[in-house]
Regions:
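Catalytic-pocket segment enriched in acidic/His residues
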Residues: 2-24, 39, 45-47, 115-224
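Residues embedded in well-ordered beta-strands
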Residues: 82-86, 107, 152
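Extended, compositionally biased flexible segments
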Residues: 1-89
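A generic structural micro-feature
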Residues: 75-77, 98, 202
Length: 224
């Protein structure tokens, strides 16, 4: 079976049998803000004392090769490569230990952000919620030690971000537990665990690639 491919019903393309795509429309996409100290510093923000999180709409999801569309409402759109976690079983008020067994897999996520609108608005829904603002890759169902996951972002082939889960302010199990004490996490939900330093604007004609090294990848052209 290794190396064989099958038709992906969501995109019409081929994907390896060792990977999966998430549901086309997850119930929710939970994103963690400022979970890498250096990223918080580069934006002039304090490191949070407890996890800061927000939601992206499922309509923001796109897949491999789909275009990130720059909206006319923004003059500064930036990439944010992240390690995403796909939930496999229901989590409500879960302990950190219990969250690990509930993970279906890990997934590359680009939390595309209209930075000027994020600074302008009192909350982040508009800045984070445009159609095409959440590219996601394949799900890797075998991923090893969560703390050793590494995310890399490349723009036009040049590395712009690199971050390890070991450098996160809050660990992945802690994040899942924390969120589950606020809202139930259901199968298919995605939790994006924050972006490392190095975020920067993207422009029409760029190609942005986010990879969880050796596990999941998504590459998208930019238009608009």
């Amino acid at each position: 079976m290794a190396g064989m491919k099958f038709d992906d019903p969501l995109t019409g393309g081929d994907i390896p049998v060792s990977t999966e795509h998430p549901v086309a429309r997850p119930g929710k996409i939970v994103c963690i803000g400022r979970n890498y100290r250096e990223h918080a510093k580069e934006l002039g923000n304090d490191v949070p004392v407890e996890p800061l999180f927000f939601l992206k709409p499922s309509t923001s999801i796109i897949y491999e090769g789909d275009a990130i569309v720059l909206p006319p409402q923004s003059e500064r759109v930036e990439f944010e490569g992240e390690i995403g976690i796909v939930i496999g079983s229901r989590l409500t008020k879960a302990s950190e230990e219990a969250t690990v067994d509930a993970i279906r897999g890990v997934i590359a996520v680009n939390d595309v952000t209209a930075r000027d609108l994020q600074k302008k608005d009192s909350q982040w829904t508009r800045a984070k919620g445009f159609d095409s603002f959440c590219p996601i890759g394949n799900i890797a169902t075998e991923f090893g030690d969560l703390s050793q996951l590494t995310v890399v972002t490349r723009v036009n082939g040049e590395e712009r971000q690199r971050g390890s889960a070991s450098d996160m302010v809050f660990s992945i199990p802690m994040l899942l537990s924390y969120v589950s004490h606020v809202m139930t996490l259901e199968p298919g939900d995605i939790v994006a665990t924050g972006t490392p330093s190095g975020v920067a604007p993207i422009s029409d004609g760029d190609v942005v690639e986010v990879e969880i090294i050796g596990l999941s990848k998504v590459s998208n052209p930019v238009t608009g």
